[in-house]
A protein has these predicted regions:
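Conserved beta-strand hairpin/beta-sheet module of binuclear metal-dependent hydrolase folds
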Residues: 2-55, 171-183
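Short, well-ordered beta-strand micro-motif
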Residues: 25-27, 151, 158, 171-173, ...
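Divalent metal-coordination and catalytic microenvironments
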Residues: 26, 36, 64, 87, ...
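Metallo-beta-lactamase
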Residues: 32, 39, 130-135, 156-246
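Short N-terminal helix/helix-N-cap motif within the alpha/beta-hydrolase-1
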Residues: 43, 65, 70-72, 167, ...
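Active-site HxH/HxHxD metal-binding segment of metal-dependent hydrolases
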Residues: 49-150
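Short hydrophobic/aromatic-enriched beta-strand-loop microsegments
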Residues: 81-86, 181-182, 277
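C-terminal regulatory/interaction regions
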Residues: 251-312
């Protein structure tokens, strides 16, 4: 399929359980275009260097601000002189999240989730460890907006905003071939992490549901994700994701007849995780709790510095 689209997939290894990210390379209107970049580390550099030596890269499109997509963009821009394209909301997130003004609140936020002190410190340290893997930041030259058209390889793609996994996440859609570069919005085997990170949209799970239903209306046949393999029938996978999260919401709701902390709810949903994985689990648990709160299914109150949620 990628050959037919005249697109090259560039797979970058990641040092996590989710062990890779797919970036993409194709000819654009004025030269070569790269979609996403990987972390800023030696593994990524060694993969991109021979590629950019052979291709005149004019544009770098960033689908969202998470480190595995955004991290190497600044260095890649410096090496190629390419323009960087990104949504304005995720440009702001990506260039402020790993700065002292944000990082100083990390441990306090984890404390407020009811997480014990040592683990709260470890979670904060894990987050801070990504600073070197996202800097230098790119200079964003153009802001991506809903409905924009991008020439990539043989075809033109429409930018579709799909907030949920991040507030400014985009997907790219070609109607002619019923193809969607789904980025991290729809993945074939795992559910994208939908987390509330104590800032931005305070009900990201609601945004994710809305974005899934938005794509569902397109009835996409071919889905090219940023993690995992190409698959067919987007709508089948969308139904599976909606059902999965509804099951999670039901599970949380059944366990909050008495006041429950974010940490306790997290332990209901997730087991045997590393510190890195636990950080995402906390964010995803909080997103589910905030969904229930926003939909008037539970109350929320703070006692002795810790947030509690209780079903209504």
């Amino acid at each position: 399929m990628l050959n037919e689209l005249e697109v090259t997939q560039v797979t970058i290894p990641l040092p996590f359980r989710l062990d890779h990210v797919h970036c993409f390379l194709a000819e654009g209107e004025k030269g070569w275009t790269i979609i996403d970049t990987g972390l800023n580390n030696k593994v990524t550099r060694d993969i991109w260097n021979p590629i950019i030596e052979k291709h005149d890269v004019n544009d770098i499109v960033l689908t969202h601000y998470h480190p595995d997509h955004f991290g190497y963009a600044g260095t890649l821009q410096a090496l190629t002189g390419a323009d960087v394209w990104m949504t304005q909301v995720d440009e702001l997130a990506g260039t402020t999240y790993w700065e002292p003004g944000s990082l100083q609140f990390l441990k306090g936020n984890y404390d407020a989730c009811g997480i014990i002190d040592d683990k709260a410190s470890a979670l904060s340290s894990d987050e801070i460890s990504f600073i070197t893997q996202v800097k230098p930041y790119p200079t964003v030259n153009h802001h991506l907006e809903e409905g924009m058209k991008i020439c990539f390889g043989k075809y033109e793609y429409e930018v579709i905003l799909t907030p949920g996994h991040s507030d400014g996440l985009i997907t790219l859609y070609n109607k002619e071939n019923s193809v969607l570069f789904s980025t991290d919005h729809i993945l074939p085997r795992i559910s994208p992490n939908i987390s509330y990170w104590f800032r931005g949209i305070n009900n990201p799970l609601e945004s994710f549901f809305t974005s899934l239903k938005k794509i569902q209306k397109l009835d996409v046949e071919y889905v090219i994700p940023s993690h995992g393999t190409l698959f067919k029938n987007a709508n089948k996978r969308i139904v599976e994701l909606l059902d999965h999260h509804q099951d999670r919401l039901n599970e949380v709701y059944e366990n909050m007849k008495e006041p429950i902390t974010v940490n306790t709810a997290c332990n209901v949903l997730f087991k045997n995780l590393s510190i890195h994985e636990s950080r995402f689990a906390v964010g995803e648990t909080l997103a589910h709790l905030e969904y229930l709160y926003s939909n008037d299914q539970c109350s929320k109150f703070k006692r002795e510095g810790i947030w509690y949620y209780q079903s209504i």
